[in-house]
């Protein structure tokens, strides 16, 4: 469970700053477009003078946007399809929770724990530092903490 102060800090300060800084970087190179998912999927296509700013701030925006999208005031049960995929990938839902918790608590400093679909189409748990996003590794994030 999250407290209001932490959520307000992340929404009104952190996320808002990532959006403002990503927009400022993108304004320097309108020719590259504004699709952060596409840009972060191949960071070598981002001009060098704004690359790190977009990795940090574009990643921060995408990471937080997914996090907000996944939040719900009500407990949600997972669908049968998702439960089956988790069982196949991790052995059980309890094993998934243990591995996901380990990814989250094992991250030193700031970062994220992720449930992703990897390049092979399989579920995988991973962790990224700071505002790095698994999109840059060719993975599709589906759960973030």
Swiss-Prot record:
Annotated InterPro entries: Mn/Fe_SOD, Mn/Fe_SOD_C, Mn/Fe_SOD_N, Mn/Fe_SOD_N_sf, SOD_C_sf
GO MF term list: metal ion binding; superoxide dismutase activity
Any Pfam family the entry gives: Sod_Fe_C
Keywords on record: Iron, Manganese, Metal-binding, Oxidoreductase
Residues given in the record as Fe(3+) binding sites: 10, 64
Cofactor(s) the protein needs: Mn(2+); Fe(3+)
Residues where Mn(2+) binds: 10, 64
Domain of life the protein comes from: Bacteria
Cofactor annotation comment: Binds 1 Mn(2+) or Fe(3+) ion per subunit.
One term under GO cellular component: cytoplasm
Catalysed reactions listed for this entry: 2 superoxide + 2 H(+) = H2O2 + O2
Magnesium recorded as keyword: no
E.C. number: 1.15.1.1
Annotated function: Destroys superoxide anion radicals which are normally produced within the cells and which are toxic to biological systems. Catalyzes the dismutation of superoxide anion radicals into O2 and H2O2 by successive reduction and oxidation of the transition metal ion at the active site.
Protein family membership: Belongs to the iron/manganese superoxide dismutase family.
Descriptive protein name: Superoxide dismutase [Mn/Fe]
Species annotation: Streptococcus canis
């Amino acid at each position: 469970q999250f407290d209001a102060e932490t959520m307000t800090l992340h929404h009104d300060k952190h996320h808002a700053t990532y959006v403002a800084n990503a927009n400022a970087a993108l304004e320097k190179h309108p020719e590259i477009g504004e699709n952060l998912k596409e840009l972060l999927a191949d960071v070598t296509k981002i001009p060098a003078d704004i690359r790190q700013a977009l990795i940090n701030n574009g990643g921060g925006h995408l990471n937080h946007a997914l996090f907000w999208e996944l939040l719900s005031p009500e407990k949600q049960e997972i669908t049968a399809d998702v439960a089956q995929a988790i069982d196949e990938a991790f052995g059980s839902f309890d094993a998934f929770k243990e591995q996901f918790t380990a990814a989250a608590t094992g991250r030193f400093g700031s970062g994220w724990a992720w449930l992703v679909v990897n390049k092979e189409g399989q579920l995988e748990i991973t962790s990224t530092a700071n505002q790095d996003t698994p999109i840059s590794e060719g993975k599709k994030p589906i759960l973030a903490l």
